[in-house]
Amino acid sequence: MSKIKNLLFTIVSVFLCSFNAWGQNGVSTIIGKIVDVVNEPIIGAQCVLLNHPDSTQITGTTTNVDGVFELKASKDKEYILHISFIGFETYTSNIALNESIDMGKITLSPKAYTLDDVVITAQMVDRFSDKKEYKLTNAEKEQYSSALSALEFLPKIQVIDQSVSSVDGKGIKILINGVPSTATDLSIISPSNIAKIDYYTQPPVQYSNMGLGAVINVVTKTNENGGIIGLNTQNAITTGFGNNTVNFKYNFGNSQVGVTYNVNYRNYNKRILDESLQYFIDDEEYRKEKTGKESPYAYEEQMAEISFNNAKADNYVFSSKLSLKSLNRRRSSVQDIMMYSAEETTQLIGESSDKDKYIRPVLDMYFNKSFNKKHEITLNAVGTYYDSDYKYNYRELLGDITDFETATDISTDKYSFIGDAMYSLNLKSSQLFVGTRYMYNNNRQKNIAGPNSIETNEVYSYVGATGMIGQNVNYNVSVGVNHNVFATLDNERYSFTYFRPQLSVGYFIDETSDVMLNYEVNTQTPSISNLTYNPYYKDPHYVYVGNPDLKPGNIHNVSLSYYKGFKKFVINPEIGYSYANDAIVPIFIRSNNNITETFGNIDYVQNMTASLFLQWYPFDNNLLRLRLFADVYHQINKYGEMQWEHTGYSIIPSIMMSYKKWGLQLYYQTQKETLSGQMLKVSPSMAYAELSYRPLKNMTITAGIRYPFYDAWKLTTETHGTNLISRVETERIINNANMVYLNFVYNFSFGKNKPNVKLKMSNEDKDAGILGR
């Protein structure tokens, strides 16, 4: 009994001391927890304290991942507490704040919608100086099979084959609770575990110079003393095609351990490679027409990862990942060749095979420390090693006689280090930051031509600020310096320094619309693959090589966008312009009586773009979503006395329907032409239809068909802007046409939810060091 009395006395003492602390300095605190009718916490509810009786706002906040809020205001005054969240009735209460108050649980009742009351994206977004924060309702989360597919809730984001990109084709950087992550990691997280999504349409300064279209940070509910098991499989039943992931994570105290395995594979037997080739050497024409036959193509890409995280909210975060990734790819082709000359026409048989494989271990260490909620230090170190091999053989046969033969055999040892450090100071309405990134690469190769070695060093240092000016203007400004040093096997060293400013200014017109102006200067750094010579012949007088004399290019980008969210409709037009000085692009030159395909620094590349994104929910309860993205672009290239241009466009309509446990998605993308230097790539059009069903909570089964009514998947590359050579290569994979597949997603979690913490950086080396064919 005495122990019970002591325990009660301790509890009462702590309770009274807490109230005493709340009441200090003339300020009292209001706390509470917002839940729905089934007692689930409501995350991101708006909690505002208004002055009584004029209703001027005193302070405000949003509920955390546990639905808890905390407001502080002067005591001995009367206020109005106003709580709101999309899909629920607004809660108001008059409060006489004489002392600190615990409101306990506040239950919000669902709102009875009429058609005109449905408000979608516009009012589900909190806007900050550098991002937009999206919160999905439970009904919206049920429309998606995984956290990865839920990213399609965001404007201009598309998810295909367990990968995510912007609709204009740019890459997306994925963070999970700020931790550098991948689409694979998201594919095994249940959408019900999403607390919010931070959407950076203009990548923060630490992610600049990566060619990204956006950065997305998915904040989840984590588990305390429990774990998560996730499975996401996508496999075709008509051909060899699969993307499969399994994951297990276990939480104990402030720590988490995880294991992930991912395997993607392709196994086709109907790949066809056609080619048309023509060039002149000493006024003699070399012309060939190659008609491909059905040939095999296969690869297996595997990744195993173990991870450990230890974090204490508002204090520190430590994260480490050790992963091993491997690739084994094989492809071959057989072609009927017609070779034309002034004297005769010769029929040949062409045979090619290429094999490439690599093993890539990566160690990623991350640490973030906060001091007094104002100061933050972030450190990130990534070490990568590549052991890769590439073998290519090609020959043309005249009967049993080899008329032409070429081969390349490259073995590469490459290791790299990326180190990042950043300090930030959080002020009332702004954040100041300073940081530096160091990147080191050492690439050693053995090939038929002999050994090769390249070493690169790059340092990028920056300082900047982000914040708000008043209630309507947000800004993000930084200045940086990029310094590059290259060293070759012959001890030749090249050094380059560039100034890199970045400015983003936005104006919030009203609660549902804004306009954004972005300007930045980036450095286009040549990759190890571009710098390595590695010659091989594609024809007797046509050779393909890297360029050790490349220097970095400088790219100026400016864009202006407008966003408007009506009750059921979103419109987002954007115009952009870029100017790349000394741009690194594929070019063709004449050298040593050969036509050489390589990479070069041309005078400039100008790109002009205009795009329009539309989204419409025409019916109640978001039953149907219609989307349309369209863009048009024009490019001008200048290289010496030559100038060439190209204009292209793309249109992407999509339809998504959701009714109870069923879902239907239809997608189409027109053919798209992309010009890079003197090579034009014609990406194929794409279409798919998917029907999904959720038999159990956190389980989704999807049946789909890819490229319906197509005869093949087709990719074409051709020369453009040069009179030295004319070459058109068309790759077709018949196996992909009318491909039927099944997708099974299941997530099981156990444990109690608690808030998460954020990381700020991500680094990765994806360059294997081999010049692609």
Where do the protein language model's features map onto the residues?
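Face-selective signature of the C-terminal outer-membrane beta-barrel domain
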Residues: E301-R329, E351-E492, Y498-P501, F508, ...
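Short, acidic Ser/Thr/Gly-rich low-complexity loop/linker segments typical of extracellular
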Residues: P53-V68
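Outer-membrane beta-barrel signature, preferentially recognizing the C-terminal barrel domain
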Residues: Y494, E511-S513, T523-N572, Y579, ...
